Amino acid sequence: MDWTTETPNTEPSLVTATPSTTESLVDPAKMKVGYFGNEFPHDDLHDLSRRLYNWSKDRQHTLLATFINEATAAVRQEVRLLPATLRTLIPPFETIFSLVSHADLRHGPLGGCIDGMLLCAVQLATFIGYYEDSTEDTFHWHNADACLAGLGTGLLSTVAVSVSPTLADMPVTGAEVVRMAFRLGILVHEVSRILQAPTSDGGPGDSWAYVVPDAVADDVQSELDAFHDAKKTPESSKVFISALSRTSVTISGPPTRLKDLFLVSDYFRDRRFVPLPVYGGLCHASHVYTKEHVDSIVNTESSSLVSLDSRLAPRVPIFATSNGKPYSAKTVSGLFRNIVEELLTQRIEWDNVIEGVIQHAKCTAVSEALVLTFRTSLPARDLVEALNSESLPFKGRTQDLVPWVTKPQAEPRGPRGAQQAKIAIVGMSCRLPGGADDTGKFWEILNQGLDVHKKVPADRFDVETHCDPSGERLNTSLTPYGCFIDEPGLFDAPFFNMSPREAVQTDPMQRLAIVTAYEALERAGYVANRTASTKLHRIGTFYGQASDDYREVNTAQEIGTYFITGGCRAFGPGRINYFFKFSGPSYSIDTACSSGLATIHVACNSLWNGDTDMAVAGGMNVLTNSDAFAGLSKGHFLSKTPNACKTWDCEADGYCRADGVATVIMKRLEDAEADNDNILGVILAAGTNHSANAVSITHPHAGHQADLTREILSKAAIDPLDVSYVEMHGTGTQAGDAQEIQSVVDVFAPLSSTKRRATKQPLYIGAVKANVGHGEAVAGSTALLKVLLMLQKKTIPPHVGIKNAINPGFPKDLDKRNLHIAYHRGNTSIVLEEGPVRSIQDSDKDTRPMHVVAVSAKSKVSLKGNLQRLIHYLEANPDVSLTHLGYTTTARRHHHNHRIAVSTSAVPHLVRQLNSHLQSADTHKPIPSTGAPPVVFVFTGQGAAHRSMNLELFRDSPCFRSQMLYLDSLCQSQGFPSIIPAVDGSYPQDHTHPPTVTQLALVCIELALVAYWESLGVRPEVVVGHSLGEYAALHVAGVLSAADTIYLVGQRARMLERKCQIGSHKMLAVRAALDEVQSKANGKPFEVACLNGPKDTVLSGTVSEMEALAEELEQSGLKCYHLDVAFAFHSAQTDPILQELEETAQTGVLFQPPRLPIISPLLAKVIFDEKTVNAKYICRATRETVNFVAAVEKALAMSTVDETMVWIEIGPHPVCVGFVRSIMSTVNMTVPSFRRGENNWQTLSQSLAAVHAAGVEVDWNEFHRPFEHGLRLLDIPTYAWNNKTYWHQYNGDWALTKGNNFYDSKKKSAAAGSPLAAAPVSSLRTSLVHRVIEESFSGTAGKVIVQSDMMQADFLAAAWGHQMNGAGVVTSSIHADIAWTLGKYLLDSLKPNSRKSVVDMEISNLVVREGLVAQKNRSVPQLIQVSISTADVDSGVAYLEWHNVTNDGVSLADQEPIVTAQIRYGTAGDYLSSWVPALHLVQGRIEALSQLADDGIANRLSNSMAYLLFADRLVDYADRYRGMQSVVLHGLEAFADVKTKPDDEGGVWTVPPFFIDSVCHLAGFVMNVSDAIDTKNNFCVTPGWGSLRMARPLVAGGRYRSYVKMIPTAEDPTVYLGDVYVLEGDEIIGVMQGMKFRRYPRVLLNRFFTPADIKNPASGSMSCAKGARSSAQSTKSPANVAESVPTPAPAPVPAPEPVPVQRNKQDTAAPPVAASDSTAAKALDLVAAEAAIELSDLQDDVSFASLGVDSLMSLVIAEKLRQQLGITVSGSLFLEYPTVRDLRVWLDEYYS
């Protein structure tokens, strides 16, 4: 809506001032005038609004963003209140500026309303942003000299400025202005359409206002009156004067009345007039609008106005456009009323406004009036001209506020928040058709314009039998063509901790997804937790997948353990998260063909929402199922011709299916820049919608596609004409291509008169499907990779889809329509641009002379491959920067156990070193799997360094420098001189500093070096200091603070300076043992200062004594040299200071307990306690001998240090590490920190390379941090996989023949004759039996099947009442209750008149093959199924089986039951009679045990003690299970007094399990508590019993006595048998006969009894045995572990044939024989020891099964391999590697 009242101005402004040169507006001599006109700035409104929105994303423009959000919310609220007829005219909008692009809306009935609202929004957004952006001009609008003026709707904008005391108030007040403008526009529209009906075409109609130049108002009014009288015009329809100026009159009225006026009026007919662009309706009409109209707009009771009135008020005067006087309102709502009334009812007289401004300027006595405008306009020019009148004492000038919007951003300030961020793509990888195993090969296909289609390969299916072009054969494809990945089965399973079996059963697309994820992460320079954006919990995975071919066809032929985890889609991204330990979200997304790009959109949203900081995203598709080919062919989706997609071809007849796996790594742009990543491309916006209005679900819709594109361009604040390339979906279908090209040209290449592409703005389009086919779920990701490669190569590859002529359905005017890169896909689209260009400043360049290049791998094969790849890269790029290469291979790579590191200064040297390592790669040893080697810090004493140093580390390393400066400040604060001149190169090397400076400098260097090493992640486990270096060692060990260390060293040095003469004594180093020195000294005097090594001795004495001694010793052939020290330490020269030194240490220093072991050269021992180091120690260490040799030898003897440790010398030159090597000849490694005369960085590089290769984890990122601005991540070769083929081939043609009704008809006939079909479902339910799912009864035969959920409260409580290893375990007493329940139910159903109860039923032959452990997650069910059946109940026998059930209720009844038992029907009387003969024997043994207890021979235990011991050994029972009141135990025999406890929890039981357990678990107590069993190293569990009968019911509170004696069996000494007798008074009422227990090594307890849902799969675990049962519910244990019930152990599972694994052709060499110290040799030693065989029996061709290695022994050996060798495998190890050769080869390859 616009109420313009003057001719549109086309002249430039007269006087302008740019914002950058504006003087301070607080100057009282200057007046500010804010002018808000009634027309948009002359800039392109689309561009202006887009720029404002873009600026709102900037972190500096938070108020601008707030205003846009508040104004948008206000308008949305108003839209919701509109009547439906108007509400439907306004489309959904993301922000108010989104409405700018809706041309139909702005030119439609509500055009005036929308434009009026947009005018206020643009003005206020520009105004707010101007003040946020300006560094010179500030928001001071409440001085007495400021004033405001406006025209039309712009007058409303002045309210926000007038009432806002600060800029921060303007977003809210501005939003209210926008709300008022919208309401005003709606009112004017509604009133005006009553005066004149809208046009039938819905367009804007004609103008409601004409300007008549050179007219006189009185004459105009007279003519109007005459016209109205003649026409008898109704009052409301009269034409009237709406505005006056000195040069013109503006008349307004209904458009038809205006036209009529100019046709019939003599006065107007011949006059010049100008129709104004006022199409929204009538304003300034007092005869039309009333007070009620004003009230409808300004509702003073609305919450928003009430809030504003309560805290704000008008402050800056606004001049009324009618009389030029300031509005007098005192409230915000009052001011709005004044202005709305002005706009609706008052005439505009601009000259009055000008006069009002002039009078205001005169009153404030200003010298200058500055008019702030939004570009130039006639009213503003008239105002400035008037202000510049010669008669006035001031001058006027304008200042345009718009230029800040259109200026380029001076420097990147970053987005306001995550939602405004751009998304950087920092890594990518792929496996695509045509041999494109990397992005380089993919680009070759694109650049050469190749079409890589081919016939379906044989490894997918037989194309001859599964393809029929005629379409006559059932279930066949019409086309034999596709685009396929070469060898999709190749995979490095051990690298990803997968067994061969798991790899074969895992979908190859999921395998390739994790491979490309690793490669993409590697190319992105990802290192876990290196930066804030790489924290593991902030990384998520997002993959598109639209099919499960491999699971449906390949692995479905032989369903195994990993059928679900290896085949279901959700496990693909989940596996990536699991392997990399990402704990962010993992999504598998299926949106058909847009899956790959929809996934990118979801990943972007995750980054924008702040849910993640890094996203691993992509798509995957590997085609193996002929069904999809057949179905797509039948649906007319696929092309029948030999080609990839014929995109845009006139004969396009469908698409060509394709494989593909692609991964990209994404971060927010500012994070990528902060992380120093390579930015391959930047995503500005992304969106997804659906073609809801398409003619079918598979048909695209141009309108929806165009809507989506406009939406994301709006989000990105990008002009469509700035887009130069569009990558299209381009499937090669007639309808799809035509619809898509239409949506593209509509948005990116319009032909409108106001917006079209210039000649220099060509638009290019392309579609990658023409090269590599349609990858379906990976199609979008593939196209994204293409565009990223185009950005890298700065080339648009040729399009090869048009084989004949262009699609005739395309627009005919493409040439006339002459994309920032835009990337557009179906109904998911993203906008891409190139990444920021980064340059390296001279000040950022890396000055280090030497660099570390690291190579690592998980296997020897890959190590060789990685070395070869890097060598080839260097040969191809000889000018590569070693700076960047070192940074890339160290800080930006993950490091594996096979490590090589080279410190180098030139590429040729590096190549030679790498070739040398390549030659020796076969004998290379990996770092220990037990972890990084421990580190010893050894601190140098005096005499090793130059007198003055120039430390490069002090110059370059902020860490080292800050530490040195901090320590220097401590020195000076304690009154010592500065040490910095001794280290910063201020003096020449031979300059001698005072001893205080020299000694303090040495110690401070060492302290700073420790801080530096620790910043690299290298920390000591032991410390030792030599002489003065011991002070630094004491600090690092925590004994002395840094301040106390400096205090002691400085005070000691000052004492020496004060009390000892410099140069009077010397220290002499001799290359000989002390004995040899003494024998060759010929009696010359000396003192022994240091014993450094077996042949390194330092002597002290006076100068003359040392010179004479040196001469004598050198004549004897010994090498001697004088140390460059001021004093002879550890000699009589130091005696004068000793007492004072001890007193100083006693009073001035606080000694703390050591945190680390300290090797003491003074005491020749290792210090651990807090008392040894004290003031006396400090004194003695100064005077007495440094016995470094004895100290290290003592530490070695105590195992404080050993040969595996890494020794790092902390000091200015390596001295002590030489001593260490002479003492420990086999020491692993010794390295220096600095070396005299060598650049610090060179020394450190060499040392870091060595310790890294030895296994010490170095924080390389920290090492490179000082130079990171000058470092770049190189795109070097990715990991060389040790690939083998893992592939389950689809066999036969069952995919074709399955399409019949044979099985359906068979199932129907079987169901019709089955007694189960009509059987009713019973209401039977107890605490342990929950649901009868089937039952059938026929004569004396019957069957009942029930299911129970272990997670139900009663069942769960029963299981958790019997805890083992911290887990709830289903005791056999639970099985007994279930058996008796079903036994009675079956009998009652078949024999309703039977009077038998459970006391008449025997549970026999209970065999528990798998223990049931309650899972931890109680939110999902844990189901079991139990069946009971009998062919003839009169036979007295029924059979029971227990099976696992999947969570969705699918029974595993086709597998071996986990528990079996029988019910035998008898009579209680017979049972009781049969036990009478045994009664006296049992009672006799009970009396004998009681007597033994009285004699102190047997143990009598109370209830609490018994169960305390039971819990300590194995089972922790809940209170209601604890029925044994006392126990008498002797050897393997015991009796117990039992009292059963009531069920306070109200369960429904047949025989409560805690009753059964209470009277029977005495046997388990004996087996796990008795001292006759080695319970420390073993535990015993029962696999079942022979018979359980209870001839009397067990009752709550009943008192019973149990007796048992266990005996080992003759066949197997690990198996024990016994009978448990239950007595009530003098009667045996129950017997558990043949209760069996088996002994197991305690090391297996955790393996057997851990809930399945919290077991951690081993990192290198092997798969289960072929055919082995897989159940989430059961623990693969030898038996149920209830102590009250026994079972035979399962037989060993026969070893299967190994999974066929095809090696690469080059990988055919036989493995080397295992060295005696290799991991393989140690593992075989362990196997031999455990199997009790000779090592010589383990020949290569021997199978482990033949040696008696059964399933149990496998579990024991697996556990010991983990504990002793750090190798984690599953118990199926010997099934995967059945022979000695198989195992040795595997261990040699991956663990040697």
From Swiss-Prot:
GO terms for molecular function: 3-oxoacyl-[acyl-carrier-protein] synthase activity; fatty acid synthase activity; phosphopantetheine binding. One of its GO terms (biological process) is fatty acid biosynthetic process. Gene3D superfamilies: 3.30.70.3290, 3.40.47.10, ACP-like (1.10.1200.10), Malonyl-Coenzyme A Acyl Carrier Protein, domain 2 (3.40.366.10), Polyketide synthase dehydratase (3.10.129.110). Residues 1-21, 1658-1715 are annotated as: Disordered. Residues 1687-1699 have a biased composition (Pro residues). Residues 1326-1651 are annotated as: Product template (PT) domain. The modification O-(pantetheine 4'-phosphoryl)serine is found at residue 1751. It comes from the Eukaryota. Its EC number is 2.3.1.-. Residues 1497-1646 are annotated as: C-terminal hotdog fold. Residues 420-834 form the Ketosynthase family 3 (KS3) domain. This is Atrochrysone carboxylic acid synthase nsrB. It comes from Aspergillus novofumigatus (strain IBT 16806).
